[in-house]
Design a protein with these regions (language model features):
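Non-heme di-metal
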Residues: 1-65
Length: 65
């Protein structure tokens, strides 16, 4: 099965969103401040990835129309 570039971007976007939720859960459950901060940092990084992928998807969709 072949996937279009936009399909691949959408799959990547979903994985990044999953990672955000995963790290948020661990940040919330962390009892040590250093561990909590590390997971909060990872959440922020994943949010950046979500934003970049969403912007690229939006560009691709606009080019198709």
């Amino acid at each position: 099965m072949t996937h279009s570039p936009i399909d691949v971007l959408r799959m990547a976007l979903e994985r990044e969103k999953d990672a955000v939720q995963y790290y948020k859960e661990y940040a919330t459950g962390a009892s040590e401040p250093a561990i909590r901060e590390m997971f909060q940092f990872l959440v922020a990084e994943e949010v950046k990835h979500v934003e970049l992928l969403q912007a690229e998807i939006d560009r691709e969709v606009n080019q198709e129309n």
